[in-house]
Amino acid sequence: MSLPRAVGRFIIVGSQVMSKAFVQAYKQMIANAAQQSTGQAAASKSSTAVRRGEMTIQEAGSILNIKPESLEEGELEKRFQKMFEINDPKKGGSFYLQSKVFRAHEKLKSELDQKIQEQSPAKPTSSP
């Protein structure tokens, strides 16, 4: 086989392989986009909070070792006090970790207050 013929064959085979790979990658991109659009609505609230620098509910629960689904005010306060005391800088703790604990408590407390408001029926206002 001559050199020009081998180079030509190499170019043809290479372009066939590249075109097949491109088509396959394009199909995968379309499939990923379709799959992502279905899960995007659920993740949009969480990703918005992360972009703004806010702590997510899952992260707050992880910091205080509380499951956000089974959130109770007494348990929240107990865990907060314990973690806040452990991370007190005056006792050799970390101010950064203490602030993370505080922000986690703040986030879970607001979530708990929101749940309580949603569960309690709206009180009718009496007009004179």
Swiss-Prot record:
The keyword Membrane applies. One of its GO terms (cellular component) is PAM complex, Tim23 associated import motor. Residues 108-128 are annotated as: Disordered. It is found in: Mitochondrion inner membrane. GO terms for molecular function: ATP hydrolysis activity; protein-transporting ATPase activity. InterPro entries: J_dom_sf, Tim16. Residues 117-128 have a biased composition (Polar residues). Residues 59-113 are annotated as: J-like. GO terms for biological process: protein import into mitochondrial matrix. Signal peptide: none annotated. It is a peripheral membrane protein. The keyword Glycoprotein does not apply. Keywords: Membrane, Mitochondrion, Mitochondrion inner membrane, Protein transport, Translocation, Transport. PANTHER family: MITOCHONDRIA ASSOCIATED GRANULOCYTE MACROPHAGE CSF SIGNALING MOLECULE, MITOCHONDRIAL IMPORT INNER MEMBRANE TRANSLOCASE SUBUNIT TIM16. Belongs to the TIM16/PAM16 family. The J-like region, although related to the J domain does not stimulate ATPase activity of mtHSP70. It nevertheless mediates the heterodimerization with the J domain of PAM18 and is therefore essential for PAM complex function. Heterodimer with pam18. Component of the PAM complex, at least composed of mtHsp70, mge1, tim44, pam16, pam17 and pam18. Essential component of the PAM complex, a complex required for the translocation of transit peptide-containing proteins from the inner membrane into the mitochondrial matrix in an ATP-dependent manner. In the complex, it is required to regulate activity of mtHSP70 (ssc1) via its interaction with PAM18/TIM14. May act by positioning pam18/tim14 in juxtaposition to mtHSP70 at the translocon to maximize ATPase stimulation. This is Mitochondrial import inner membrane translocase subunit tim16. It comes from Schizosaccharomyces pombe (strain 972 / ATCC 24843) (Fission yeast). The lineage of its organism: Eukaryota, Fungi, Dikarya, Ascomycota, Taphrinomycotina.
